[in-house]
Amino acid sequence: FGALDVSIINFLSGCTVLSMTMYSVIKAKIAKDSVINMKLGTPLAIGAAIGGLFGKELFSYVESLFDTPNTAGAVQAFVLMLITLGTLIYTINKNKVHTLHVTNLLACLIIGFILGGFSSFLGIGGGPINLVVLYFFFTMGTKEAAQNSLYIILFSQITSVGRSLFTTDLSQISIVLLIGMIACG
């Protein structure tokens, strides 16, 4: 296939994640096994989608501050390390932590925005971070948090892939490669 630009690789990866999350969410709905809390999950997902756009812009800005992309990558890695450390500390001590029961629409939008912003800035799906946030702010169990996390990621990926359709030259993409990644994802 040859070497592809990073923006093309990111687009292909985003399409793969989008297809995986869409499949998981739809499969759970059809099987009547979905525990997605639409009242909380939808504002979280909308906030995450908007936050994801902000996170991409923030990363572009941070990247423009340095002469080499590696320096921006180092900033990204440092922030990821801090968040991962916080996630680890929470996970180890979660039985000792008093969780919240956030239900306010604006709070859900803001929490979603922050999740989407971090996930996009860091270039990650957000899974483990989403789970910790859903456990803490919404006192969700493991299955409910996992399904709501996939729902949030689904919205974020729709926005991200949609943005890429308008901002990335996709002429290098082999349709066979795209279909293969989506089907095998």
Name every feature range the model reports, one short phrase each:
Residues 2-6, 25-117, 166-185:
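Juxtamembrane transmembrane-helix boundary motif
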Residues 10-18, 49, 146-157:
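Transmembrane helix-bundle signature of multi-pass membrane transporters/permeases
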Residues 18-22, 77, 81-84, 154-158:
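Small-residue-rich packing faces within the transmembrane alpha-helices of Major Facilitator Superfamily
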